[in-house]
UniProtKB/Swiss-Prot annotation:
Miscellaneous comment text of the record: According to molecular mass, may be composed of about 112 residues.
Protein name, per record: Turritoxin F21-2
Functional summary from the UniProt entry: Potent inhibitor of human alpha-3-beta-2 nAChRs (IC(50)=566.2 nM). Irreversibly inhibits the acetylcholine-induced response on human alpha-7/CHRNA7 (55% inhibition at 5.6 uM) and alpha-3-beta-2/CHRNA3-CHRNB2 (91% inhibition) nAChRs.
Source organism of this protein record: Polystira nobilis
Keyword Cell membrane part of the UniProt annotation: no
One cellular-component annotation, GO: extracellular region
Keyword field: Acetylcholine receptor inhibiting toxin, Neurotoxin, Postsynaptic neurotoxin, Secreted, Toxin
Length: 28
């Protein structure tokens, strides 16, 4: 699911940008 989510995140990066630090922490 990570690839699909990452792709979605990439397309909507501007929308989730505020959560980017959290996303990276979660990814780690």
């Amino acid at each position: 699911w990570f690839r699909s989510f990452k792709s979605y995140y990439g397309h909507h990066g501007s929308v989730y940008r505020p959560n980017e630090p959290n996303f990276r922490s979660f990814a780690s």
